[in-house]
Amino acid sequence: MTMKIIQTAQAPAPVGPYNQAIAANGFLFTAGQIALDPQTMTIMGEGNVEVQAKQVLTNLGAVLQEAGCGWENVVKTTVFLKDMNDFAAVNAIYGQYFDEATAPARSCVEVARLPKDVLVEIDCVAVLPT
């Protein structure tokens, strides 16, 4: 199996021993993205889940683009929420990137804590274009 590391300066550098994404066997597997500004590495929208969700999806989009993918290539996402009461607010932002007719499969879970105490984290799996 051939694996290719995907990295871009348009998304935050990893905050641990992992890569932004790995391309393997026709798929792209992204690391979870949080609301870090790629240039300053500071949290955007502290305490504001809408601002954080937008930054998360902006970061995720940059990783997808670096791999030659777009939102239309995404087949699965996982959304991690600090508080499930933010579900509707995150869905409103998420829906700006994925419409109901073409949205990928998704899991959404509430977790006790996320890196850097953010409110939302999202990762995805995409099919690489041929």
Swiss-Prot record:
GO cellular component terms, A-Z: cytosol
Gene3D superfamilies hit by this protein: RutC-like (3.30.1330.40)
Pfam families: Ribonuc_L-PSP
CDD domains: YjgF_YER057c_UK114_family
Database matches in InterPro entries: RidA, RidA_CS, RutC-like_sf, YjgF/YER057c/UK114
Molecular function as annotated in GO: deaminase activity
Signal sequence range: none
Tree of life domain: Bacteria
NCBIfam families: Rid family detoxifying hydrolase (TIGR00004)
Family membership: Belongs to the RutC family.
PANTHER family, alphabetized: 2-IMINOBUTANOATE/2-IMINOPROPANOATE DEAMINASE RIDA, PROTEIN HMF1-RELATED
Protein name: RutC family protein slr0709
